[in-house]
Amino acid sequence: VRLVGNHPDVVPWLQALDVFVLPSYANEGVPQALMQAMSCGLPCVTTNVGAIPEPAWDGLTARIVPAQDADALRLAIVELLADQSLRGSLGAAAREHVVATHGRALMLDRMEALFHKAVEAP
């Protein structure tokens, strides 16, 4: 584990990882760090807190463990580190899902629709 501080471009750091872990335990929306990791095709281990289960589906796009369960977190990390095929399939599914549901083009289309709606409102 290496804490590298704040960086304007996280993609090179994410690409250097084997597994991304976000052990949130309270008050989460949809974490941008998780979305960035998933969009880079990283297999992720996270918790079932807040809106995290929206992009992270256990066994499909990520491994989800109960919040504050250190043993479950450890087991999920060990499982992914030991299984390259599982890392690849979860990472690919994560990227496909995040790009399809939260990709830049989709977000821009949604924002444009909101602006049009706001301008047309009485």
Regions picked out by a protein language model, each given a short descriptive name:
Residues V1-G5:
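Nucleotide-activated donor-binding/catalytic signature segment of Leloir-type glycosyltransferases, i.e.
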Residues N6-H7, W13-L17:
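Short alpha-helical donor nucleotide-sugar binding micro-motif in glycosyltransferases
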Residues V11, G29-S39, P53-E54, L60:
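Short alpha-helical segment that forms part of, or immediately flanks, the ligand-binding pocket
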Residues Q15-G29, L42:
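Acidic donor-binding loop of glycosyltransferase active sites
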Residues Q36-A37, V45, L73:
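Short hydrophobic faces within alpha-helices
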Residues P43-T46, A56:
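Short hydrophobic beta-strand element within catalytic cores of glycosyltransferases
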Residues D58-G59, R63-A70, E79-S85:
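Conserved acidic donor-binding segment of nucleotide-sugar-dependent glycosyltransferases
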Residues A72-L75, E79, L86-T101, M107-A113:
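A short, well-ordered alpha-helix in the C-terminal region of glycosyltransferases
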